[in-house]
């Protein structure tokens, strides 16, 4: 059953939802459990979320829907809500409502006492307001017990309680127990104390619509095989969202949870299991798959994979949970709570993409630094250095810096920048395309690390090289100059759309979601390999 029957009264004159948007709204309205709206970028998920909140309110499925959106998109969402439903009663947690702790408390009070068609809140503020302390402690105790069982199972399977896997699990268990004890003993965070006496359950919110839901993918999975590359511990905001979803289900509103994302699985197969934990735990339990070990046994395979070493000087074989099995059964389970749309389904008018790798020869200086990374990695693996002093994640990060320019490394601030490295290669490509695209003011994006204040940084170096190659300085901008100010960001993006700014530099995070500057876009230059596959979407 599609959504063609929806009349959507109240929508602005001249605005029409596309068929797939109505179908998604209708699917979520009919659902008894949560709904994952996994629609490709550009399919119109914002309007889907807005229409879902208003239709749920109109039809009596919800009385106070809350939309949780990335911080920098709050104003954009508010504008889209009013564009779609000009007469809607909307409450938005904008910058003014976050001015100080007292203004935040006042905002939550308005949520609780008002009759709203939609409440729009930024991710960060949403995650600071928790369910009741009693509920949190109960859920934290359950997670500690899960780790304890995983430790016991791992020690039994390995026959050695000193095994590295057992140690990792035990460390995760202790961390979870410490967090639980701090909360029990009244050692709350500053944010918790600022919101003392306000609980999520007291707001009257009976529907959650979460935009860019993959931001909440980091739910830990306590498993005895902790050496498979799975994340053990959860991010605090993910545990918080899980608590709220569980409360909504207990209150009889389990069908009023909708997640929206274009990348439901961005980095690990366990993310699909976590989506089911959020949205369809009842189905998991009915199938006997409510533990990750059971789910992985049914749908996954552990296979040897060849991976590049973190230090970048060779390859290693690792056992990873990296292949699905029983795919028909898995897809059937996923379809029960997922509305999926790909570009093949709706044929968005996208330009043909040409991906061009730009090889840059390694310098002797970079080779020396890479050899040092190899030595550091050996010391880390041998346990010869405390994790807080050095670890494989730090080594990988330093490798990225070396590839861009060794001058970014700590202690190398006084080195000369590379003359013919990635930055110079990028500058030459940007300048060439700038010249070719001048007749129609074609624009370009440069994705790299964050510009530092004071001293040398890669952004300013790239800009200086572009100016030296003939690109006017006034046509080059850093997205970070606009900060988190939505008005300044929109002013900057308007200049890019008009062609006044021809080169915009920024990080994946800053130039990703919500950056609508594609009208004149001729090229994107990625100087850093992104951490996650989803960052290439």
Task: Mark where each language-model region is.
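SF2 helicase motor core recognition
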Residues: 126-133, 202, 216-217, 267-269, ...
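Conserved SF1/SF2 helicase motif Ia
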Residues: 36, 40-43, 48-79, 251-255
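Conserved nucleotide-binding/hydrolysis micro-motifs of P-loop NTPases
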Residues: 72-75, 97-99, 124-127, 214-215, ...
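Conserved Walker A/P-loop ATP-binding site and its immediately adjacent core
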Residues: 48, 61-90, 97, 123-128, ...
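Inter-lobe coupling linker of SF2 helicases/translocases
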Residues: 105-150, 164-167, 171-174, 178-207, ...
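Pre-Walker A adenine-sensing motif
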Residues: 22-28, 244-247
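Conserved Helicase C-terminal RecA-like lobe
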Residues: 2-19, 29-33, 48-53, 57-63, ...
């Amino acid at each position: 059953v599609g959504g063609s029957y929806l009349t959507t009264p109240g929508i602005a004159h001249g605005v029409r939802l596309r068929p797939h948007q109505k179908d998604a709204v209708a699917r979520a309205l009919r659902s008894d459990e949560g709904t994952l709206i996994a629609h490709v970028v550009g399919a119109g998920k914002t309007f889907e979320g807005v229409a879902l909140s208003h239709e749920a309110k109109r039809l009596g499925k919800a009385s106070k829907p809350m939309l949780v959106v990335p911080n920098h998109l709050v104003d954009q969402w508010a504008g889209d809500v009013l564009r779609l439903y000009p007469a809607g009663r909307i409450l938005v947690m904008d910058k003014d409502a976050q001015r100080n702790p007292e203004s935040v408390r006042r905002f939550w009070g308005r949520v609780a006492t008002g009759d709203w068609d939609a409440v729009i809140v930024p991710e960060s503020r949403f995650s600071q307001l928790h369910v009741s302390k009693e509920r949190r402690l109960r859920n934290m105790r359950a997670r500690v017990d899960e780790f304890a069982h995983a430790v016991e199972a791992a020690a039994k399977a390995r026959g050695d309680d000193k095994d590295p896997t057992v140690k990792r699990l035990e460390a995760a268990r202790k961390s979870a127990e410490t967090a639980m004890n701090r909360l029990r003993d009244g050692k709350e965070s500053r944010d918790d104390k600022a919101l003392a006496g306000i609980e999520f359950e007291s707001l009257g919110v009976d529907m959650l619509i979460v935009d860019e839901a993959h931001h909440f993918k980091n739910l830990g999975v306590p498993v005895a095989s902790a050496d498979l590359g799975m994340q053990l511990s959860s991010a605090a905001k993910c545990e918080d969202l899980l608590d709220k979803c569980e409360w909504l289900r207990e209150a009889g509103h389990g069908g009023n949870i909708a997640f929206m994302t274009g990348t439901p699985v961005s980095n690990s197969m366990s993310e699909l299991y976590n989506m089911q934990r959020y949205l369809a735990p009842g189905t998991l339990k009915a199938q006997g798959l409510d533990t990750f070990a059971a789910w992985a046994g049914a749908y996954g395979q552990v296979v040897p994979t060849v991976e590049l070493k973190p230090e970048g000087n060779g390859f290693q074989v690792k056992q990873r949970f990296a292949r699905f099995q029983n795919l028909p059964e898995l897809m059937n389970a996923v379809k029960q709570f997922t509305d999926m749309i790909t570009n093949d389904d709706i044929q968005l008018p996208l330009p043909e993409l040409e991906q061009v790798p730009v090889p840059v020869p390694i310098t002797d200086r970079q080779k020396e630094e890479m050899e040092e990374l190899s030595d550091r990695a050996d010391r880390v693996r041998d346990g010869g250095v405390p994790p807080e002093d050095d670890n494989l994640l730090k080594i990988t990060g330093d490798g990225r810096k070396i590839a861009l320019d060794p001058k970014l490394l700590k202690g190398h601030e006084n080195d000369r920048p590379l003359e013919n490295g990635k930055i110079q290669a990028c500058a030459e490509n940007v300048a060439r395309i700038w010249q070719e695209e001048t007749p129609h003011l074609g624009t370009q994006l440069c994705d790299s690390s964050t510009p530092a204040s004071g001293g040398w940084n890669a952004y300013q170096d790239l800009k200086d090289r572009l100016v030296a190659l003939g690109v006017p300085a006034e046509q080059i901008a850093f997205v970070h100059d606009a900060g988190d100010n939505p008005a300044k960001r929109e002013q900057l993006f308007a200049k890019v759309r008009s062609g006044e700014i021809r080169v915009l530099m920024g990080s994946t995070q800053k130039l990703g979601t919500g950056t609508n500057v594609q009208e004149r876009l001729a090229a994107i230059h990625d100087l850093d390999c992104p951490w996650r596959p989803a960052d290439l979407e």
